């Protein structure tokens, strides 16, 4: 295996294609903000609102990228995302961040969705790791306190989905229109785990440590259906199961995010338990979630597999399978990681206009989804490149 050549592919993809596109096309120097929507064809919508998920993911990505390549332009992108989040998203009266904000800084949707609040913590922790900015650390810790106060469920464990802007119960808790309106979800827990893990890197206190362990246990004991090797997506407050959908992208993403959390926590028995789960979930994903050409299906609902290959499950497959190879040293997982990367190179990367398509359909032609939007930032593909560079660096040492 020529590790150096393999690594260079990810380095070039990250700097020349993904980050370069965001610097040149998504940041608007005149308005000092980001375009909240850009189509596949490159049409820009200056009036489009910025979502919290989108803006925090820009902050995380460019902060993380700066740690690999400390360049002034990456710092500027991170600084601008930081400024926008602090000046316009942060609720000065109640704390926490709004769901979406218009380009002029006025809130569009003021709800507090804990998925987005977690991404704020994840990004602020990364900004501190990159620039040692004390305000970022302060904000990340404040968000931890708010989430423990308003999202944590002391009765049944885990975290609820959403509150109003002033932390009251809300009658619509859904993350997006396609989600169920329930109290708890796998997706929100996955990104709270990811955020708390990053916070623990910068704020090593017992309170955070206990919560990282609690979240890993929630995944192993409640969210993972051990019998079938899939994560359950939706629950009532008391963990009554509310869905029978298999999400292959989330399954493979969770294998490595759970493992990362366990390793940051550093408890041997938890690491071993997570590794066992990661191997089983990887095997199930290979057997059920991959098409013959190497693309990962979006999901299976009511026995029907959706023949759609969105960008983000492909990115998570590269890292997830590589991580399982690192755990097992079984060549098949490395092969599947490389196969996923080849599928991305062949079908997902937009070689003409830059960045990645939303995905491809069964005919392997690009889907109509926007290239940049509330749910499409530089995070899944940018993080994949950085994770692969980091992991290959460790092997080369």
State where each predicted segment sits.
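Glycan-recognition and catalytic cores of secretory/periplasmic carbohydrate-active enzymes
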Residues: 1-397
